[in-house]
Amino acid sequence: MITPFIFIPRRKSLILPTPPSGDELGGIENMANPLKQLAGETAIYGLSTILARIINFLFVPFYTRLLTTASYGVVTEFMAYIAVLQVVLVLGLETGCFRFANREGVNPAAVYSNALATVFGISFSFLAFMVLFSGQIASALGYAGFENCIIYIGGILALDCTTAILFAKLRQEHKAFRFAIIKTVKILTETAANMVLFFWYPSHVNQFMGRFVSPTPDFTYVIFAILVSCIVCGIMFIPDLVRFTFKFDRKLLRQMLVYSIPLMVAALPGIVNDFLDRILFRYLDTNAEAWRSSLGIFQAAVKLSVIMNLFIQMFRFAAEPFFFQRAQNKGAKQLYAIVMEYFTAFCGLILLGVFLYLDVFSLIIGKDFRSGMGVVPIMLLSYMLLGMLFNVSMWYKLSGKTNMAIWITLAGLAVTVIVNVIFMPRYSFWAAAFGHLASYLIMFIISAVLGARYYPIPYSWKRISALFLLIGIICCLSMLSDALVFPGVNIGTSSALSEGLKLLLHTGLLLAYCAGCLVVLKGRYRQALAAEE
């Protein structure tokens, strides 16, 4: 998958298949403890993802100062298209490879040959289409004169979708370190390309580079940097391709597609739900002439919310093997319920940590983007609900009713569409933010209700509600104190004394939240240990 600086949520990896005899984790494979091996590999796979998110966040100050709001909006729109098209072009064959490569009597080489040939053919045919009609596509999107950017997107998709199968093969063979190394090199290449383009090229404009990017910083820099990283990634896979044994099996391919295409269809609502609002800005935003600016401002606010997403991603890496490992334990359900409470409390700490110091966080982004700072707490709460949704959704994974996930996601997608279509023409990016919040809330409620029916877990909704009440009280006290005691005091524009006192009070409120969490969760840690025995 792409690791661009514009955040794109990753497709979640499935449970890895039974490992082969070789082990590239640096030691002899421990067949007696596959879950320990899985957890170790998950941690390695997660390093590149977490690194991408961190670099992603670190580049926000540069992007929001070196790009206009409109240019940043264009990048956001393009990345939304890429995210959706990736799911379509891979056809779900990543997962299909895992399933068929482990079937008795099936040659894994034939499985990956079929998948690689199919995805390569489709994605590079799509690239050819983008090249042939780049002018028409650019004009239709309102980017006449930027045909090269359309071609870059086609190249990104072709290379990224093809290497997705090769990455799947590395996972199948448990070559976790090689997987992480290639991903990391790709991320660092993109970082270096961005540094060169934004900080060196504008003062060293030349005819050669002028064929690929604009002479002054704009969205072409970001897209071209991603393309360069995809090319480097493809080059690193050349040794694998040289050793690759191509065995095409038409019958096997048909079986793989019958299995994989429904998975692709099932994944589409989820990815569309995450990125639909970015696409709708073009058609529904309040100011039709400045919709790109609105989208850029919204995306900057989303970027400041990435700290919540980073924690959730790290939690997911650890939580899935944790949940599955204990699924058969007597006290498993009680343990899951307690985990949910601690997860909620920590997410609340992150939310308040940003909300109470929102003035400080606003200094990260450029002045032109700060009109969207009010959206940040809404997006933080949205992502918090998304993380809680992951927790309550374990029921259909543990009970085998994974088909329910499609309907839950479709319900969330419907809410996203309704909220944005009705409110975006009037409220612009505020509608997009509340669309996320409403969508994740509905999905959370539906999943929790169905989970109580099919796989009941004794969640303490009183404690969880108490935590949310505590978060709400702290937020209200913060806003009340700012209005009554520190009116007009903003970090960076007021006296040092008033700024210091304001930060001191907010720190006290954050400590009060921590103390409140200790009261709400009193005794639950011991109960978790008891449930583990």
Indicate where each model-derived feature is located.
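Membrane-proximal transmembrane or re-entrant/amphipathic helices at the cytosolic face
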Residues: 6, 14-17, 24-28, 32, ...
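Signature of the first transmembrane helix
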Residues: 33-94, 122-134, 154-156, 190-191, ...
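Hydrophobic alpha-helical transmembrane segments
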Residues: 147, 151, 180-241, 266, ...
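Interhelical loop/hinge segments that connect adjacent transmembrane helices in multipass membrane
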Residues: 18, 26-34, 38, 205-221, ...
